[in-house]
From Swiss-Prot:
It is an enzyme of class 2 (transferase). It comes from the Bacteria. This is Cobalt-precorrin-5B C(1)-methyltransferase. It comes from Halorhodospira halophila (strain DSM 244 / SL1) (Ectothiorhodospira halophila (strain DSM 244 / SL1)). Pathway: Cofactor biosynthesis; adenosylcobalamin biosynthesis; cob(II)yrinate a,c-diamide from sirohydrochlorin (anaerobic route): step 6/10.
């Protein structure tokens, strides 16, 4: 795949990470090629599409075929250096003549999911093809139709090879998307390890929970804390928000779109960072201050030796172990400090917050009970 303006790399950002293309961009390329094959009997290879921000990538076709009343084309998704589950998957579109005056009609084929719950950008019952890709798929068909002097009335069935199996590795089952993957991509360009993509998933999870009338959501930093908080509160899957490192991103969205009860659950290291004011608790944003953690222990009665051992520990978990050995309720104290950070971000008139700390085995080691301010 190539682009007439620049290669899909991350050189502009000064990194070695290679950019890729979203499933939506691949589907748009396959759709334009399939439509052209349906109308003219020949397939453009490579096929060029227009994306937002003046990008015009060209995609090589991996498959193309046509028969009586249908044409199919597909491209292999290149996710660049992003660990996307669909990297290397065949994204294909089968085009068939549509009803006169109906324009472009999109259908979910094998491996593409169908929305079953409200709260997402696509209505329940519709193929899980987000508004961004829908827009540039339709734009590509309009441009191809104009070039061929043909109407735009066409039915496009999108498919993703092995998509139903791959979807189990995504948030789709929790969001109420059944049968396969979503076709995503606001701009069509896939930036490796994009924070924006994760935050968007957090927001969609909150939207689905609100639409389902759920009044208690739990944001967790990882799988262990998610399983632990679900067991602790007996929450349905729809109430679980995989916030990862983006505690601030979740809380800021909840300020705009509140839920009455919000639990923040995580391991000792990440919740300690939240307690110390970090809103993004990834290690790249900095390390927890062990000296400050030792001071917290001091306020609980830790002696000088205990504080020194904690301040010079190799990890937060090691410092916690020392405090627990001394019989100090450090987990509860850190949870209260983390809760105060969180309360500064939400609307106290609309939500109350609880913080839970878990160790690596999923055992609760700290809690700050429900509070609004």
């Amino acid at each position: 795949m190539s682009e007439d303006t620049s290669q899909p790399t991350d050189q502009q950002a000064g990194t070695a990470l290679r950019r890729g293309w979203t499933t939506g961009a691949c589907a748009a390329a396959a759709a334009r090629a399939a439509f052209t094959g349906l109308v003219s009997g020949s397939f453009p290879d490579p096929v060029t599409i227009r994306l937002p921000r003046d990008r015009s990538p060209a995609f090589a076709l991996a498959v193309h075929a046509c028969g009586d009343g249908w044409a199919r084309a597909g491209v292999i998704k290149d996710a660049g250096d992003d660990p996307d589950v669909t990297h290397g998957a065949l994204v294909s579109v089968t085009a068939r003549p549509g009803a006169p005056g109906r324009g472009v009609q999109l259908r979910a084929g094998p491996g593409v999911g169908t929305v079953r719950r409200s709260g997402l950008p696509v209505a329940a019952g519709e193929p899980a093809i987000n508004p961004g890709p829908r827009g540039y798929i339709e734009q590509g068909i309009a441009e191809a139709a104009a070039a061929l002097s043909a109407p735009t009335d066409v039915t496009l069935e999108l498919a993703i090879e092995d998509g139903e199996r791959l979807a189990a590795q995504t948030l789709n089952p929790r969001l109420g998307i059944e049968g396969g993957l979503s076709v995503l991509g606001t701009t069509g360009l896939l930036v490796p390890f994009s924070c924006a993509a994760w935050i968007d998933a957090i927001q969609r999870g909150i939207d689905v929970a609100r639409a389902a009338g759920i009044e208690h959501v739990a944001g967790s930093t990882g799988r262990t804390s998610e399983q632990a908080v679900q067991a602790y509160h007996q929450l349905p899957d729809e109430a679980l928000i995989d916030m990862g490192d983006f505690v601030g991103g979740m809380l800021k969205y909840l300020r705009r779109y509140p839920v009455p009860r919000v639990t923040i659950a995580g391991g000792v290291a990440k919740i300690t960072k939240l307690a110390q004011g970090f809103l993004d608790v990834h290690s790249r944003r900095g390390q927890a201050d062990l000296a400050a953690l030792a001071e917290t222990a001091g306020r609980l009665g830790a002696d000088a030796t205990c504080r020194e051992v904690m301040a010079t520990a190799n990890t937060v978990a090691e410092a916690f172990d020392r405090a627990q050995a001394a019989g100090l309720p450090l987990g509860d104290a850190v949870a209260r400090e983390a809760q105060q950070t969180a309360l500064n971000l939400i609307d106290p008139a609309c939500s109350e917050v609880e913080v839970l700390l878990f160790d690596r085995r999923g055992q609760r080691v700290g809690r700050a009970g429900w509070a609004r301010d």
